[in-house]
């Protein structure tokens, strides 16, 4: 049995709260078990230099953790004066994942700036960031549509992410911190609503994993993504 | 009448939620109107170099704003690679204010690290940080007392802070963002529960202010601080 | 009796030397007792981005200390690669204080860049910087008037600053380093020549201070500011 | 047909030159087609702080590109003052991949510091870095064994890496720059000599990829890794 | 006898390999004994701000060492986040030396960006960088001439550099690392092909040197420069 | 005739004021014509890591310019967050020059930290820094001798520095800013009182210089150094 007492294929409970803060065009609190992240999507009426004049938009993401979102207080990155490699890796992943369901030519010359800030961490912050940020982006696009700043939505489908892993030889879905820190393999999967693979990043922390392990993990991920996209749709319909 | 429709001497509604996040020894969400700040107090079992071996503790504070806590998205300080002068000024103020009610010799050689992170900003973030952080520190000290790491509380009294200002010639209590950006004088007052002055920082944004204005602002501040300390006590008794 | 042997209401001797260095439009050496600061005002024929095209000017200030201006050598901020929080706080204060007596719409689209560099420190460097920099700005404006770059002076009055404190229970004017490091309360007051309050920043280092202490400190400050503005006028008439 | 005229399952020609530079304990030039990388392994007789006193060793990696290793000159990271997110991501990957075949308890309290510096880039620099660095590490360990600094090798197997992708709908092995920049999916696979998966990082640049695509890519990768490990063994036997 | 067994006036063997890497307009590997440096010259179709619109070009240089190009691994400057004073000093020297034989008005509004990256160091890296970079610049200019981007070559002559020193009282040419670290005086000389002096930088590491020592060192340098320029010409004729 | 109306072999007037500021163990204002520099020498009772436990001392130097010491205001290096290549080059030169007349084994395990801060610049700031800093170091050593912290002076002789150049074909001594910016060759010479050469750094800004030019420049430098060392001795005898 896993430390969290969940079944191997059991997701943590997910809550997606829209309009969580007041200023952003899209603002979502996502809670996956004890992991809590504020995801905002801000509209910036310009594009980065490399896209200027090309008639298309951009989406980019930043990620941060409150210093005491974790069990041991981490040093504040703003005070240290630089973002860690882990932070950079995660924010690049979030950006790529969200762009995979955006037709940026329909956005016009503007940028959707996503911010994912972890209030409380219990594993899976990068995947929850993607799942939550999709809803925030959806709301920001909704604002643009209502203002008639764009004619059609650039969003081409849903995208969500979940972690899977091999814990004591058994493939498992949606690892919390304790499970993650003890597992042999840790993999993050990003999928669209038609179950196309957008990103997969797997690391064998201890033993290498086999292609059979991989298949079982992908089965679990597929099921988890389906539930997470259902939760996104649910939240967007409220 | 002021933009917020409040009376000149009327504080915004204050909510202090303890145990807001799970990991920190003290964790508080303070809400003053639309201003929402997470204040955590973490215990670090060492002191900075300049105090090592002196048999006393230390308390220090850091402050940050989520990029989209404000109306316009601000650049993330971690991404920019440095904290602004404003951030540094505020975190130094929070640290001094909280140390004013701490007998650090009773803390032992450990540091209370305070983090104030603004989730949503509507004026008065530095004063709300102080008011909320006091409660988080109180809870962190409580943890140390329960673990018998210290014998007696180092806390010597309550401390809270509030802003006052002169808006269209009339002194007013607890300015929100709109009031703050239009007022002539903006002053932040930090006081203890016996109404001793700990910090005062006043700036004439437009016209200089007179000693008479100052007196009226101090009267308002005194009343506001009383109410805020009552809210702190209330929260600590729950 | 105070360590400096001065009476509680006695300012240190003040010397203001204009045209101290050759290149700047305004260049002043101010000496307050053993505190010696070079204040220069440079004219830059452009404004920061946020003011471009608005038909008004700007004034900004920077502050630094020579590494061995103090008793213990401080690390050079340029070598460390960042300015301390204290430095940032002081230079923001100097800028605000000087802007309080400038009608920036009369300056045209140019910036007055003030630099205050402490050659020797003995307490009160931020207040002496303000008092000295005012004269440097006055000279820089004089250059612009003589060149007919502007038609009328943007300067609307004098501004000067002084510290006050409570030392062993007695309010005192213009603390030197020794007095400052032992006092209970330390307050910096910035006033105009009609004794309007522009900035006040008070900190209780030990015991909180009362409103009665505050009143006595303000009386002292008022008297000190009057003498400092007389010294400015004296220097400007030479 | 692919731009490089290779068959879909055809690796670029691989050259591994040992003892390429004189100072490092292990120094390898790896050439995969036009991609050329110097990989060195240096022995440092201490471990990072977090491992001090734990009786085990560490392996860490850094990665860089000469500014004109690419078609367009890139800004020198040392001059810019920071490493890009891409650089950090790659060097973290190289370190994890190499540690997967190291029993660090057999290394003693020392660190193997790997440096991978790209002299000329034509796609696949991160995977070639891993393949080449393994040989450099092997040589550095050889030095320690010959000096009898360690008793048994900490190396538990071979590790190598290769890229695979989907180019115009067809899965392909070992993409060069041109192929990489036009392909729909780009995946980097790290495997051991018993074909255990150590890392997989796949990104759909255009269309999401299916599990069937993934299977075909893994088949290709498996074959490529076999050939690369044969090349490593070949080089180590010379 | 000197540690390297060479005669006092004997240069190390020099190899200049053109077209060493594929992307740069000029790319040279220079080997002086065990010192090996990749020198590239890249053409950038713009000039720095201070030259914009002046109808002339610019040439600038950067210098770096691979972390393990030296006997002890050096910290990577990109990871440290800043270039050392030594690095800055060397790259400024390389730029000045190369500009001394360039008529920048004939280059048009473009910049030649030189990069000198030390693959293996054994003394004399800054002088070998200059000698090698000249050839790379020559090739980059050749590219511009062939493309008819410029009409006439901006190159006005050859430039090369060599070190001389006083080792155990005897002036010697072209010091390797061992000789350099033990010598009393270390001097770098940059000369044109008509033996005009462009740069000389001499440092007495131990005893000061006399004008007689200086004369003997200059005689040696003159001879060395002649041989190095012959090697440049040789390489350019191949 | 030269712009400054001086004869080719005429030094600017030199003033060396000791005890210029109060806190440093040695504090000197040196004025060479309009160039004015504060040179302080501070005693630090420890040595850098690389010398710890070796029973010898160290001397190091830092250099800075006040932002408006020059005709155009320069950006403050502390605000920019890094020192320029020029600054680093100069402070390394000052350190080497002063160490050339120090027997560091007689200093004990302490560091002399030299700071040269340019108050007003008119050419020759690096050479004046060396000449002035020698006197400050002499005073700091005097303090150590008086306190009997050391038994014998580590100072082995005088050191001073001067610039020479070729201006319109004529070698000249001690260039001011105007002369320096128009001259063909600019050379800085550091010599001891027995006229041993410690450093020479010459750059042909326009035409290369000949060995004959060099000889004439060295004759001028020799004479200038003699006068500067006489001024140092004079100041030290007052």
Swiss-Prot record, chains A, B, C, D, E, F:
The EC number on file is: 2.7.7.56
Lineage, top-rank taxon, reads Bacteria
Residue numbers binding phosphate: 86, 124-126
> Might you name a Gene Ontology BP term for this protein?
rRNA processing
Classification via CDD domains? RNase_PH_bact
A Pfam family hit: RNase_PH
Which reaction does this chain catalyze? Answer: tRNA(n+1) + phosphate = tRNA(n) + a ribonucleoside 5'-diphosphate
Q: Which UniProt keywords apply?
A: Nucleotidyltransferase, RNA-binding, rRNA processing, Transferase, tRNA processing, tRNA-binding
Q: Which GO terms describe its molecular function?
A: 3'-5'-RNA exonuclease activity; tRNA binding; tRNA nucleotidyltransferase activity
Question: Whom does it interact with, and what assembly results?
Answer: Homohexameric ring arranged as a trimer of dimers.
Family (UniProt): Belongs to the RNase PH family.
Q: What does this protein do?
A: Phosphorolytic 3'-5' exoribonuclease that plays an important role in tRNA 3'-end maturation. Removes nucleotide residues following the 3'-CCA terminus of tRNAs; can also add nucleotides to the ends of RNA molecules by using nucleoside diphosphates as substrates, but this may not be physiologically important. Probably plays a role in initiation of 16S rRNA degradation (leading to ribosome degradation) during starvation.
- What is this protein identified as? Ribonuclease PH
Organism field: Nitrosospira multiformis (strain ATCC 25196 / NCIMB 11849 / C 71)
Give the gene that encodes this protein.
rph
């Amino acid at each position: 049995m896993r430390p969290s007492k969940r079944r191997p294929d059991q997701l943590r409970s997910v809550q997606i709260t829209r309009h969580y803060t007041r200023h952003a065009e899209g603002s979502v609190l996502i809670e996956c078990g004890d992991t809590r992240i504020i995801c905002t999507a801000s509209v910036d009426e310009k594009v980065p230099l490399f896209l200027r004049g090309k008639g298309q938009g951009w989406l980019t993401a930043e990620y941060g953790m409150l210093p005491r979102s974790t069990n041991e207080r981490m040093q504040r990155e703003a005070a240290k004066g630089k973002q860690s490699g882990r932070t950079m890796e995660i924010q690049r992943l979030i950006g790529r994942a969200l762009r995979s369901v955006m037709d940026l030519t329909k956005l016009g010359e503007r940028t959707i700036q996503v911010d994912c800030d972890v209030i409380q961490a219990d594993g899976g912050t990068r995947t929850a960031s993607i799942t939550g940020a999709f809803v925030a982006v959806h709301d920001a696009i909704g604002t643009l549509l209502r203002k008639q700043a764009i004619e059609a939505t650039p969003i081409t489908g849903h995208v969500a992410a979940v972690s899977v892993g091999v814990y004591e030889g058994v493939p498992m879905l949606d690892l919390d911190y304790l499970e993650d820190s003890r597992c042999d393999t840790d993999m993050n999967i990003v999928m669209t609503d038609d179950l196309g693979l957008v990103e997969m990043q797997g690391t064998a922390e201890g033993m290498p994993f086999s292609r059979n392990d991989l298949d079982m993990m992908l089965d679990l991920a597929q099921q988890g993504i389906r539930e997470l996209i259902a939760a996104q749709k649910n939240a967007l319909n409220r």
